């Protein structure tokens, strides 16, 4: 007869122990099917655009030209199939696969894969739902009080900003946002950016928040230099919004010297929507209180898992993250990083030849990215975006207001020079 006093999680683990190895092996067919497709993935050696055939590996409608990976990515077919396989397996025995040992082991494997891809320890990686959630965990969990200050610039995305304002109202610390000279971005140097951050620190600044790559002009901040400067001037925590970087460029968080780094896997990692990652430097974890209150929390005391929402969630999405990462790593071996840079250079050359357009993004690659903005004269960027989508199937992000009228493009490896040529032809 079962012990009625045995905690639910302990009971589940105990009851499934004998089934563990066999149940875990049930994941193998899904993983093997994915691996077989991945091993056959290669860019074509022939033709003028060897990456063009990659589009067939995605689910995009044939009449859509997608230049908006910076807002939300699209999942490769094989990654989506793996996700469906995990979900189908879960539904064969929801109790076993949602709450028992096999799923725990598979989740630990995914955590290790994510940590390796980002250049940090598995005991420093928290599964979240998105970047905004990660900053809510930090703003709510750090012991910030009256007299403390959080600083960030106007380049900060709202998802990395609003939580600080919310908790400041209830706990009394201050939040200060300084103006970033966005119009000067094409001519800024790394030293200029570090100096700008330095000028806006005070002896009360405990937290500096900044994007790795911002979502307006795609400026790649020199994080190591900024983190070293900030720490040397008494800033306790450097927290980074990496939503636009992980999957777009190679990232090694340990080498960046930051304390927290959050990202969303639904953008450049091309993973299922609803999965995010938060790096918490080992020595910084003790400074953050968990804000989730859930059952069985004592089981994870002393572990980074204490910061996760362990209620019922779609764990198939979490497992698929490892497959999405494997897909991106495969593309890297095929020259994906160089491809994205080449597309950016091609767009920049097209802008330079048109007097009604202005390049608003960094000019040097060390500060640049696969997200870039084009200043537009004589037409409202919102109307241009609407017309280009409704009549021609182009998807990109317009920004308009405060004397800022731009088209933001964020291209990925399967986009082509032909699509770019057509874009500028339609733009006029």
Question: Model-predicted segments: where are they?
Answer:
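Pyridoxal 5′-phosphate
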Residues: 2-7, 12-428
